[in-house]
Amino acid sequence: MSVRLVLAKGREKSLLRRHPWVFSGAVARMEGKASLGETIDIVDHQGKWLARGAYSPASQIRARVWTFDPSESIDIAFFTRRLQQAQKWRDWLAQKDGLDSYRLIAGESDGLPGITIDRFGNFLVLQLLSAGAEYQRAALISALQTLYPECAIYDRSDVAVRKKEGMELTQGPITGELPPALLPIEEHGMKLLVDIQHGHKTGYYLDQRDSRLATRRYVENKRVLNCFSYTGGFAVSALMGGCSQVVSVDTSHEALDIARQNVELNKLDLSKAEFVRDDVFKLLRTYRDRGEKFDVIVMDPPKFVENKSQLMGACRGYKDINMLAIQLLNEGGILLTFSCSGLMTSDLFQKIIADAAIDAGRDVQFIEQFRQAADHPVIATYPEGLYLKGFACRVM
């Protein structure tokens, strides 16, 4: 008999709406013992079967749902089916947009909670972010090897969130050759170098692909400031869009060096690109105090908020940095501003920008809205999957 997680009375509603998480407060009791990440059945207070998921005794998310089908076992065949379903959409997208790199698995939205897989050419980069994902590591890798025999698999599960579920951080090759120090990929006509082994996340922010392309419409003959530039994807796109100058700012010398290489790789005019290693908050104030002006500013900061207790502080940070950006823009200038914090809703982010404009003493028009690229889908029953949001704003 399987181990069962029994919900408290009235706490089954979210599962009936097919939300994939069970929080600790919804649990009445466990029937049987389960190890970290083990597959369990989830039932209501009367014993009616609801879902099958992975158990995580130390996490606020006590279980993550693998399936709502009582006949479905969680095995190699299960992961093979999920991967094949996800690949159909990515195949179409890759053909339409000419991509050689994309997000293959976007966690809960692809029916595989806690699992992220990015494909860069013939390298699959894996992140296992939950206890259930780690427990099923062998089955998942077996399915990947069968479906993608041409691909090497590299583990980038070196993320702090694993500690919340009692797991060690892991990184390194799983199968096949080691990725090169810098792997070239193609995106909307750009060639970009990706550091799979040491870069942020899985090596590159694929989710901003369409936003980088959209930048080109605003930059012709304009002076552009690219904040939190990382390896320069927005800078390369701005140069391809015909900007007169782009200044890229980041705290990482290594990231800026790759950004410079990306400009050269695309045979763009390096004299139009400036690379500044500095703290963005500090530099924006310096620019303001000495009267610097820009026509377009890209503001793509790292995540400011990890949990609800940090939300108010994050709001202040977003407001401050966008206020400074608005002050630096010429009349009619464009601010392209983003938040990758899942707890930051689009409505709240828009309000923060509006408040920043008021504090800056400028009027702002919202002219375009952004979200993560189409290979990062959001399943309707899991709205938390929409984590990246952005706006193009015209400053009056």
Curated annotation (Swiss-Prot):
A GO cellular component annotation in the UniProt record: cytoplasm
Annotated keywords: Cytoplasm, Methyltransferase, RNA-binding, rRNA processing, S-adenosyl-L-methionine, Transferase
UniProt domain PUA: residue ranges: 2-81
Reactions that this protein is recorded to catalyse: cytidine(1962) in 23S rRNA + S-adenosyl-L-methionine = 5-methylcytidine(1962) in 23S rRNA + S-adenosyl-L-homocysteine + H(+)
Chief site of localization: cytoplasm
EC number of the protein: 2.1.1.191
Key word Hydrolase present: no
InterPro entries attached to this UniProt entry: PUA, PUA-like_sf, PUA_sf, RLMI, RlmI-like_PUA, SAM-dep_methyl-trfase, SAM-dependent_MTases_sf
GO terms of molecular function: RNA binding; rRNA (cytosine) methyltransferase activity
Localization terms from the record: Cytoplasm
Pfam families in the record: Methyltrans_SAM, PUA_3
Similarity comment: Belongs to the methyltransferase superfamily. RlmI family.
PANTHER family, sorted: RIBOSOMAL RNA LARGE SUBUNIT METHYLTRANSFERASE, S-ADENOSYLMETHIONINE-DEPENDENT METHYLTRANSFERASE DOMAIN-CONTAINING PROTEIN
HAMAP family: 23SrRNA_methyltr_I (MF_01857)
Known role: Specifically methylates the cytosine at position 1962 (m5C1962) of 23S rRNA.
Protein name as annotated: Ribosomal RNA large subunit methyltransferase I
